[in-house]
Regions:
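A glycine-rich dinucleotide-binding beta-alpha-beta segment and adjacent secondary-structure elements
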Residues: 296-362, 369-370, 389-406, 411-417, ...
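N-terminal FAD cofactor-binding segment of flavoenzymes
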Residues: 19-81, 393-404
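Dinucleotide-binding Rossmann-like beta1-alpha1 core, especially the glycine-rich loop
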Residues: 49-59, 84-100
Length: 457
C-alpha cells in the first residue's frame, strides 16, 4: 500500500472518509469503540448508526439538503448508495430503515480490503502521521481531554440549548428595524418591537407551549445550575441547565415580566413606527457575513419544533419567518472551529490532525457525511504533497466550510440551508423563492463541478 491513515470513529463521517480513502488505495486503520464501549446514545454495534430521525431530508435540487446530496454524489459518496439500499417511502425526502442502513454501511466497510477495523477505544492521538478524528458530538473521557489539549482548551465547548435561526428575506421589514441600544456603534441588530397586548399574548402562548422530552443521555450532561423551580411536572424542566442557556420557555414560566427584564428588555430602543420605546423587544443577530441568516437572541429553547413555529411566529416581524434551524436542547461537544481549524479542517497548530463530522460543527446526518468526503480529499492531497483550496463559497460544501472557519464569537453548529449561500446578483435574481433556490442550486452545482475538475485527485 502506498499510504496508511488512521480514522477514529465509524459514524457517518468516519465511514464516508474511510471508504473514499480506501478507494484511492490508502490502507485505512478504522477504530470504533463499539461494542467495547457505548455512548449513552448508541445502542447497536453497527456503523453509521442514526440516533434520532431516520430521515436524510429532502432530495429536490432546489432544497439545501438536495443540493448537498448532489455535491456529495459528485465526490463519490458511498453512504448515499447505502441509503438507496435501505430507502423507505417518505414523499420527497430520502428516509431509510435505520437498521438496514447501518447494516449496509457496515457491510461496505468490512468488505473493503483496504480497511482494517479495530473494535477498541482510543484515548490518545498520534500526530506523527495524518489522522482523522470523527468521533462525534458525544466524544468523552480521555480522548476528549486529549482533543482539549491539542486545541488549547481544558475541555471542549459544551452547550445545553441553542436558539432558532431564520432567513433575512422572510422577515417583515415594515415592522423589524435595525438599531443598537442607545444608538451606540453600528446597528448590528434587527429589532422586533412588541406593544403590551402583543407581548401578553406571546407570553401566554410561550408559557403554555409543549416542550420536547429530553433523551435519557441528554439529562446526564455536565451542568452547573440549580434545578428550575418552575418545573410544572414536565421532564424537560427537571434537569439542571446553565443559567446563561436558560430556555426561553422556562424564563417565561418564572413570571410575566421576567423576559422583559432579560433578553426582551426594550431599554435604549425606539420603535420608528411609534416614536416610543417598545413594551418589549426581541433582537435578531446576524449569523453570517452576508446577513442572510439571523439568530433569535436569547431564544434557547426546548419547545417542540411545531410549537416553535407557532409561538415564535407571534413575534412582530416574524409572522412569515422561514426557520432554517429550530432551537434544540441537548448535550453536545464541538470544536471552536473558527479558532482552531484551517479550511482543510485540520488543526492550525497540529496540521496532521484532521476533524470531520458533528464534532467540527457540521450539524446533520448528511452534513457529517459530506464533511468526511471533504476531509478525506484534503488528507489524501496532503499525502500527495498537494494543497486543495476549499470548495467555492457559492457551493453548499464551500459555504459550510466558510461558516465553520470564519471568526464568530457566537459560533454554533450549522447544517445545510440556502441562507448561507451568497445572494444571487440582483439583476438575475428571481422573485419566486423556489425559482431563486433553483438558480442558486444550479450555480452551486456548476461551481462545484468546476472545483472538482480543477482539483482532480
Amino acid at each position: 500500500m502506498k499510504y496508511q491513515v488512521t480514522v477514529l470513529g465509524a459514524g457517518l463521517a468516519g465511514c464516508e472518509a474511510a471508504l473514499w480513502l480506501a478507494g484511492k488505495g490508502v490502507q485505512v486503520e478504522l477504530y470504533e469503540q463499539k461494542p467495547t464501549h457505548f455512548s449513552p446514545a448508541h445502542k447497536s454495534e453497527g456503523f453509521a448508526e442514526l440516533i434520532c430521525s431516520n430521515s436524510l431530508k429532502a432530495e429536490r435540487l432546489d432544497s439545501a439538503s438536495g443540493l448537498l446530496k448532489e455535491e456529495m454524489r459528485r465526490m463519490g459518496s458511498q453512504l448515499l448508495n447505502a441509503a438507496e439500499v435501505a430507502r423507505v417511502a417518505a414523499g420527497g425526502a430520502l428516509a431509510v430503515d435505520r437498521d438496514a442502513f447501518s447494516a449496509e454501511v457496515t457491510r461496505l466497510v468490512e468488505a473493503c480490503p483496504n480497511i482494517t477495523v479495530h473494535r477498541e477505544r482510543v484515548e490518545r492521538i498520534d500526530e506523527s502521521a495524518p489522522i482523522l478524528v470523527a468521533t462525534g458530538p458525544l466524544t468523552d473521557g480521555a480522548l476528549a481531554d486529549e482533543i482539549g489539549k491539542l486545541t488549547g482548551d481544558e475541555r471542549l465547548h459544551f452547550y445545553d440549548a441553542v436558539a432558532p435561526i431564520v432567513t433575512a428575506e422572510s422577515l417583515d421589514h415594515e415592522k423589524v428595524f435595525a438599531a443598537s441600544r442607545y444608538d451606540r456603534g453600528e446597528a448590528d441588530y434587527l429589532n422586533c418591537p412588541f406593544n403590551k397586548a402583543e407581548y401578553e399574548a406571546f407570553h401566554a402562548a410561550l408559557a403554555s407551549a409543549e416542550r420536547a422530552p429530553l433523551h435519557d443521555f441528554d439529562t446526564g450532561a455536565e451542568q452547573s445550575a440549580r434545578p428550575d423551580p418552575d418545573a410544572h411536572g414536565k421532564k424537560a424542566d427537571t434537569v439542571t441547565v446553565y443559567e446563561g442557556c436558560m430556555p426561553i420557555e422556562l424564563m417565561a414560566a418564572r413570571g410575566a415580566d421576567t423576559m422583559r427584564f432579560g433578553p426582551l428588555r426594550p431599554v435604549g430602543l425606539v420603535d420608528p413606527r411609534t416614536g416610543h420605546r417598545p413594551w418589549a423587544n426581541v433582537q435578531l443577530r446576524a449569523e453570517n457575513k452576508d446577513r442572510t441568516l439571523y439568530n433569535i437572541v436569547g431564544f434557547q429553547t426546548n419547545l417542540k419544533w411545531g410549537e416553535q413555529k407557532r409561538v415564535f411566529s407571534m413575534i412582530p416581524g416574524l409572522e412569515h419567518a422561514e426557520f432554517v434551524r429550530y432551537g434544540v436542547m441537548h448535550r453536545n461537544t464541538f470544536l471552536d472551529a473558527p479558532r482552531v481549524l484551517e479550511g482543510s479542517l485540520c488543526l492550525k497548530e497540529h496540521p496532521n490532525v484532521f476533524f470531520a463530522g458533528q464534532i467540527t460543527g457540521f450539524e446533520g446526518y448528511m452534513e457529517s457525511a459530506a464533511s468526511g468526503l471533504l476531509v478525506a480529499r484534503n488528507l489524501y492531497a496532503r499525502l500527495e504533497g498537494k494543497v486543495l483550496p476549499p470548495p467555492p463559497v457559492d457551493t453548499m460544501c464551500g459555504a459550510l466550510i466558510q461558516y465553520l472557519t470564519t471568526e464568530n464569537k457566537h459560533f454554533q453548529p450549522m447544517g445545510a440551508n440556502m441562507g448561507i449561500l451568497p445572494p444571487l446578483p440582483e439583476e438575475s435574481r428571481p422573485r419566486d423563492k423556489r425559482l431563486r433556490y433553483m438558480a442558486a442550486a444550479q450555480r452551486a452545482v456548476a461551481s462545484f463541478q468546476q472545483w472538482l475538475d480543477e482539483n482532480a485527485l
